[in-house]
């Protein structure tokens, strides 16, 4: 059975550092309000679904850990700039298609000498891209526009959601108020369950049937 085995977070929202282990069948996150339950789920979405990939860089204000931002403000330098690092370790069947794409011995900044399946996400300041920003940084300003967001597998290969090794369905009922929950569930299930080719075929067939239905109405 394929599943998420563990999660490692650095500098993301509420957590300066956090490690979570998951079991194979069911996991329940319990805690008080603002304890970070949603942050854990958001971290998984960020990695597997490449959340924020096309978002405006200003969103980083809300993603950086406030303690790391405060540490930078207290001692502003390129070295102390806030960053985000997330690892999702996976339990995959080695015989599964593309499984080797996620398998690696040395991965991430932790450089663990262990062979595992997984994906990592990193958001950090690009010194080459931000050449000439040193003075601004020393004044305590975070150059959000010069940050890069990267997704790579533990095999150090670029990760794209189309190669997602397992289906991941995230239903956030707090953000579905503008649409019926059932429709929201169906839309999310459709996106998560089927590959791009199947989704494209279904959308084209639906569009053709819709056009045909309107044509049959005989409207002027």
Q: What role is predicted for each listed range?
A:
Residues 1-53, 57-74:
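Pre-Walker A-like glycine/lysine-rich segment at the N-terminus of P-loop NTPase domains
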Residues 2, 15, 79-85, 114-118, ...:
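A general secondary-structure signal for short beta-strands and their flanking turns/coil
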Residues 6-8, 19, 85-89, 118-122:
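Beta-strand secondary-structure signal
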Residues 10-12, 19, 76-78, 110-111, ...:
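Generic marker of residues within folded, mature protein domains
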Residues 11-13, 26, 90-94, 125, ...:
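Short, flexible loop/turn elements at secondary-structure junctions
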Residues 36, 44, 82-84, 117, ...:
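Generic hydrophobic, aliphatic-rich segments that mediate packing or membrane embedding
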Residues 43-113:
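Conserved P-loop NTP-binding catalytic core
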Residues 94-218:
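Electropositive, glycine-dotted interaction segments
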